[in-house]
A protein has these predicted regions:
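Active-site/ligand-binding loops adjacent to catalytic centers
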Residues: 35-38, 45, 50, 104-177
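Short acidic/polar capping segments at secondary-structure boundaries
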Residues: 27-29, 58-62, 91, 117
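Receiver (REC) domain switch/active-site residues of two-component response regulators
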Residues: 20, 83, 150
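Short, well-ordered alpha-helices that flank and scaffold nucleotide-derived cofactor binding pockets
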Residues: 76, 100, 104
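Active-site/ligand-binding-proximal alpha/beta "capping" segment
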Residues: 48-89, 146, 158-173
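Active-site-proximal loop->helix
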Residues: 1-44, 122-140
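Generic beta-sheet signal
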Residues: 1, 24, 56, 112-114
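Short glycine/serine/threonine-rich phosphate/pyrophosphate-binding segments
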Residues: 1, 6-11, 88-99, 178
Length: 178
């Protein structure tokens, strides 16, 4: 169950896994659309015992896996001290879990959050639609540790697209725009 504004690549990936894709209309307010997606998922779970809803915006396992695995992997693989970490905010699990792990290793390091320009809710902005899938969902997640980051960067869609293209062409890093 996803907003109909998701990329064609995400749709194909879901279909490739054999899942039924249910699209909810994103009427220029990603927050309301995400709420409707969650309500639809909860209704389906009530009606069908085979439906599992991970509740990633409130599930403490989300940041915990980043504390115990992703954050540890970063510490093990980076040669030398880590001075900064930047992460988009979607469910809040990545920045919370990795941020807490890295801060424990170096309390002086800086952590920056990233929000899309048209869904910068943490920065006090309005909620609209944007192209940076996976972040800026129009909600402040329950699992987000808002004390872990020092600053929030607001990124325009065009800037995110341009940066992803530069990373691909100059560094060979094939990442998405979020």
């Amino acid at each position: 169950i996803m907003p109909d504004s998701v990329s064609e690549e995400r749709r194909k990936l879901i279909n490739h896994y054999g899942a039924e894709l249910i699209l909810i209309h994103d009427d220029n307010n990603i927050g309301e659309c995400i709420d409707e997606c969650l309500q639809t998922a909860m209704r389906m779970a009530e009606e069908d015992p085979n439906v599992f809803v991970p509740q990633q915006f409130i599930n403490p396992a989300n940041p915990q896996v980043h504390r115990s695995h992703t954050g540890q992997e970063i510490l093990e693989q980076v040669d030398g001290p880590i001075h900064g970490f930047c992460s988009g905010i979607g469910t809040g699990g990545t920045i919370t879990g990795i941020g807490e792990t890295l801060k424990a290793a170096n309390p002086d390091m800086e952590i920056w959050a990233v929000e899309p320009e048209h869904a910068a809710i943490l920065s006090g902005g309005s909620i609209g639609s944007h192209l940076q899938m996976g972040i800026g969902d129009g909600v402040i997640p329950d699992i987000l540790n808002q004390n872990i980051y020092q600053d929030i960067y607001i990124v325009k869609d065009e800037e995110a697209i341009r940066t992803a293209q530069e990373l691909a062409s100059k560094e060979g890093i094939m990442c998405g725009i979020s």
